[in-house]
Amino acid sequence: MKLHASGEDYLETILVLQKKLGMVRSVDVARHMEVSKPSVCHAVATLRDGGFLTMDEDHFLHLTDVGREVAEKIYERHCFFTEQLIAAGVDPTTAEADACRIEHIISDESFSRLKEAAAQEQD
């Protein structure tokens, strides 16, 4: 199943909230993303059907291995671009918003090359 940027955002949010809270419910995702609970329910159903997450009997959300892999990939890109943009002098709020857009459209090859170039600059 091909994910849209919004699906990737939900997975990334669940990952971040799991790191912060431990256990995550749909209401936590809705609050964090500032979206309605019905929007989260629809996204959760789509992601569950796609094999990216599960929901237990207590309504806690759990990323599957595939879901975690996607979430970690997006989160890594988000952090990288946010840091790079801030280092280049971009306002943190703008850097965060721009990173959120870039993380979804950049190819794996381009991201890998940028990471390598940034690492070489730090050496």
Protein language model features and the residues they cover:
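C-terminal regulatory/oligomerization modules of transcriptional regulators
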Residues: 97-123
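Basic, amphipathic "hinge/linker" alpha-helix immediately C-terminal to the N-terminal HTH DNA-binding motif
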Residues: 59-77
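Residue-level signal for threonine
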Residues: 4, 63-64, 107
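N-terminal helix-turn-helix DNA-binding core of bacterial DNA-binding proteins
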Residues: 2-35
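A generic alpha-helix surface/boundary motif
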Residues: 78-80, 96
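Clustered cysteine/histidine zinc-coordinating segments, centered on FYVE zinc fingers that bind PI3P
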Residues: 84-86
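Helix N-cap / loop-to-helix initiation motif
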Residues: 36, 89-93
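Canonical helix-turn-helix DNA-binding module
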Residues: 26-57
